[in-house]
Amino acid sequence: MHHHHHHGGSGHPESNTPEKEVPSVIARHVSQYACQRKTTLNNYNKKFTDALEIMAENYKFKENLQACLEAKRAASILKSLPFEVTSMKDIQGLPCITDDVRDVIEEIIEEGESSRVKEILNDERYKAFKQFTSVFGVGVKTSEKWYRMGLRTVEEAKASKSLKLSKMQKAGFLYYEDLASGVSKEEADAVTLIVKETVALVVPDALVTIAGGFRRGKPMGHDVDLLITNPGRPEDDELLHKVVDLLKKQGLLLYEDIRESTFVEGQLPSPKIDALDNFQKCFAILKLYRPKVDNSAVGTSKKSDMAEVKDWKAVRVDLVITPFEQFAYALLGWTGSGQFRRDLRRYAEEERDMLLDNHRLYDLKKGIFLSAGSEEEIFGHLGLDYLEPWERNA
């Protein structure tokens, strides 16, 4: 079954262009799996999906993971629709729409906004958790602790003398403004170039590939995911350490946390949909020097103003070392989106009897690992039509 939107040419009389096609006809054919839907950044239903994502986040803060997943799934489905939802008829027959979600959509159609979401945005706990989790190294568990201590804002947490902070959280506070401001495509490209040049000094023929939202065509992100793979050579555990040392020597490394590989040859992919991967990797914060701007002001400024003129920005970077034979799987996993990756794994298991993770694909029926040299081959193994990275913004 191909649950793609009929964009003409499939021989059915009803498959006109999406404009002419009745929304309810489209809705009935939408797959429950993001890996069978094209989802570009062109979202006709932003007012609905924004609301559902706030709901999902609130559920996450309350650690109600099932409800969180349901709201996220519904948002993802609405993102894929080639038309704007204007009546409840439009969503008839869509998969994965819970009553919870339906109520929110209905109210937005009727009132233009959701009272439920307004409530969340005004909720003291939600607002505090939203602030806390925007700090690098702070998750729901830590937020919970800080909230119980009576803290409500990043400012208050920063000023608190009684917090035991991890190395990660200290860096998160130290570079908070920079990290919270997000990363532009230009900044991501500049970071990629720095890493490419540094890697080339260690291994000239290694490949550095940007993944994540930027590979999916997003103009902004909150970090830069870079995969480093070395086609010509067996794995070298030292490559990452050498690259990190060189970045340090150049004075470009503000923070690093290296995790060694935990990959076990021959082990089956984890059946957990959200399992982390086992690659050797470094979570880092890089010092990105800003392009020199008009310097006339700087020359005349007194020493006290110099603090204002910080000529660099802290940027979050993940460096991931991927063995060449696992590269296609790593690229597919790290390109995302998160929802796309989750649904791809779910599809593999539920529809194909296969286990997929960021390292490999295992066919449970045949009892073999399926190798792949490209993302296209992985889609092929799964019997899926290929989706370009920019069509995976689920």
Which residues are covered by each model-predicted region?
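Structure-specific DNA junction-binding interface
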Residues: 1-121, 141, 162-394
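Generic anion/oxyanion-binding catalytic loop in active/binding sites
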Residues: 60, 132, 146
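Low-complexity, Ser/Pro/Thr/Glu/Lys-rich regulatory segments of predominantly eukaryotic nuclear proteins
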Residues: 126-129
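Catalytic cores of DNA base-excision repair glycosylases
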Residues: 134-136
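Fungal eukaryote-biased detector of long internal structured cores
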Residues: 141-143, 149
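Class I SAM-dependent methyltransferase SAM-binding "motif I" and its flanking Rossmann-like core
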Residues: 157
